[in-house]
């Protein structure tokens, strides 16, 4: 079947100031954009149209995969119509769609079938119909497993055969690479978060003289950085990303130097880093002072374009341009606040200092 559009999400799990390790989370997208898709007929053949060379006819002709409703057939440039078998007749119509494989990114293969059987990852014409793209010795047609055959048009009639090949998508990808990442920062607004209290500590001074106490507060703060990519992706393969990281902590959106990192499908964690603040607090006699650790977290969604490359078992590579959104939350700053001190005792109990 036509592969679903998947939403690829890369997550940063651990980091140092020098480098970051990437992991991936994959989720289905509601967006219908994918490189293998149907395009409405417009009187000409679109770029990337899927085709075969039919050498049985004379002269030989190029047949483009088309459909009318869910009925598969071939598109002819001779009359700019889709020819498909239906109702015992070879139908023709200009109201049709042509199958397009943008940038030839999907690795398409014809595989043997017989009497309604289908190889894995066969390409269907509609999500709700069990009709598949096929071809026989006489050209393109439709496979109907329920009827145990391939139908095709021949000399104006609908004909059938039990021997055929089905169009399939090769999903034996062993590696994916995303590079040439270009962020579109113009017009992007960094959402500056409100300062939030992460941790509190209270220091008491029951003595009769002022004391200075050192307070250290620490907190693990989770942030997230990811690339949402609108393209078909493959599960269970190693993926390499070469990209800089937009800095939203300072609201400047400056992009760091590019770094190359490997990641694997299946993770769904976020990054967690420990932050610490230390402050010296002068505490008056017989008083209690509260110290707070405050952090500000900024967010931004930055559109980007990139080149996505697949490597298949056997060494074949395909590539395409992709687009998406880089989503990030970053800690902008942490600091300590000392609140108004409160009285916890009576200084009258303290001996008066001698003159």
From Swiss-Prot:
Propeptide boundaries: 19-27
Xref: CDD domains: PFM_natterin-3-like
Post-translation changes: Contains 4 disulfide bonds.
InterPro entries, per the entry: DM9_repeat, Natterin_C
EC class name: hydrolase
Tissues and organs where the protein is expressed, per its UniProt entry: Expressed by the venom gland.
Record comment: activity regulation: Inhibited by tissue-kallikrein inhibitor TKI and trasylol. Plasma kallikrein inhibitor PKSI527 and classical inhibitors of serine-, metallo-, thiol- or aspartate-peptidases evokes a minor inhibition of the peptide digestion.
Gene Ontology cellular component terms for the protein in this record: extracellular region
Alphabetical list of Gene3D superfamilies matching this protein: Proaerolysin, chain A, domain 3
Subcellular location as annotated: Secreted
Signal peptide: 1-18
Domain of life: Eukaryota
Record-linked Pfam families: DM9 (PF11901)
Keywords: Disulfide bond, Hydrolase, Secreted, Signal, Toxin
Documented EC number(s): 3.4.-.-
Molecular function terms, GO-annotated: hydrolase activity; toxin activity
Stated role: Shows nociceptive, edema-inducing and kininogenase activity with release of kallidin from low molecular weight kininogen. The cleavage occurs at Met-Lys bonds.
Family: Belongs to the natterin family.
Protein name: Natterin-1
Taxon lineage: Eukaryota, Metazoa, Chordata, Craniata, Vertebrata
């Amino acid at each position: 079947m036509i592969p679903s559009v998947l939403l690829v999400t890369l997550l940063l799990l651990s980091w140092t100031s020098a480098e970051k390790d990437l992991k991936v989370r994959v989720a289905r997208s509601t967006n219908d954009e994918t490189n293998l898709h149907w395009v409405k007929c417009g009187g000409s053949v679109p770029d990337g149209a899927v085709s075969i060379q039919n050498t049985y006819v004379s002269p030989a002709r190029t047949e483009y995969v088309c459909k009318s409703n869910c009925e598969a057939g071939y598109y002819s440039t001779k009359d700019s119509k889709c020819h498909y078998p239906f109702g015992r007749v070879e139908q023709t119509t200009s109201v049709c769609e042509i199958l397009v494989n943008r940038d030839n990114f999907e690795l398409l293969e014809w595989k043997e079938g017989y009497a309604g059987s289908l190889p894995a990852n066969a390409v269907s014409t509609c999500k709700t119909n069990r009709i598949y793209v096929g071809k026989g010795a006489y050209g393109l047609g439709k496979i109907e497993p329920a009827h145990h055959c391939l139908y095709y048009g021949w000399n104006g009639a609908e004909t059938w055969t039990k021997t055929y090949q089905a169009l399939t998508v090769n999903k034996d990808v062993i590696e994916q690479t995303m590079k040439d990442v270009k962020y579109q920062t113009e017009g992007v607004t960094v959402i500056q978060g409100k300062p939030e209290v992460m941790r509190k500590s209270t220091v008491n001074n029951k003595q009769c003289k002022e004391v200075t106490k050192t307070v250290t507060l620490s907190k693990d703060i989770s942030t997230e950085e990811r690339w949402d990519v609108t393209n078909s992706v493959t599960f269970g393969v190693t993926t390499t990303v070469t990209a800089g990281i937009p800095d939203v902590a300072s609201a400047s959106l400056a992009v760091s130097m590019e770094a190359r990192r490997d990641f694997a499908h299946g993770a769904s964690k976020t990054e967690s880093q420990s932050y610490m603040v230390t402050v010296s607090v002068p505490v008056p006699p017989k008083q209690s002072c509260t110290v707070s650790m405050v952090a500000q977290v900024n967010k931004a969604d930055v559109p980007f374009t990139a080149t996505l490359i697949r490597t298949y078992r056997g060494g074949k590579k395909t590539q395409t341009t992709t687009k998406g959104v880089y989503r990030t939350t970053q800690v902008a700053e942490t600091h300590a606040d000392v609140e108004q001190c409160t009285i916890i005792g009576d200084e009258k109990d303290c001996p008066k200092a001698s003159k």
